[in-house]
Amino acid sequence: MKKEIQEGDITTLSFEQALKQLEVIVENLERGDVPLEQSIDIYERGEALKKHCEKLLKVAEAKVEKIQLSQEGSPEGVEPLDAQ
C-alpha cells in the first residue's frame, strides 16, 4: 500500500515530523512501484528532510551540557558536551 508523502515547507517541521516523512519516503522507494520521475522528486525531498533532521540534531546537541563536579562530588557548573 502506497503511503502519501507530505508536501510543503520542510523548515517548519519538527524533528519527529520530518523523520516520519522520511520513513514514508524510504518505504515508498523500497517498494519500487513509484514511477521514475516521482521517485526522483521524493528522493530529493528525502535528502532535504535528512539535512533538516541533521540540523535540528546539531541544535539540540549544542544545548546539551555536561555537569562539572567539584572534588567533593557536588555540582560545580556546566560545560558543553563534547561531540563524538
From Swiss-Prot:
InterPro entries assigned? Exonuc_VII_S (IPR003761), Exonuc_VII_ssu_sf (IPR037004)
Q: Which reaction does it catalyse?
A: Exonucleolytic cleavage in either 5'- to 3'- or 3'- to 5'-direction to yield nucleoside 5'-phosphates
EC category name: hydrolase
- For whether the record's keyword set contains Nuclease, the answer is yes
Q: Which GO terms describe its cellular component?
A: cytosol; exodeoxyribonuclease VII complex
Its Enzyme Commission number?
A: 3.1.11.6
Q: Name one GO biological process term.
A: DNA catabolic process
Where is the protein situated, by its record's location annotation? Cytoplasm
**What are the record keywords, sorted?**
Cytoplasm, Exonuclease, Hydrolase, Nuclease
Q: Name one GO molecular function term.
A: exodeoxyribonuclease VII activity
Q: One of this protein's Pfam families, by short name?
A: Exonuc_VII_S
Subunit field text: Heterooligomer composed of large and small subunits.
Q: What does this protein do?
A: Bidirectionally degrades single-stranded DNA into large acid-insoluble oligonucleotides, which are then degraded further into small acid-soluble oligonucleotides.
* Family membership: Belongs to the XseB family.
Q: What protein is this chain from? A: Exodeoxyribonuclease 7 small subunit
Q: Which organism is it from?
A: Bartonella tribocorum (strain CIP 105476 / IBS 506)
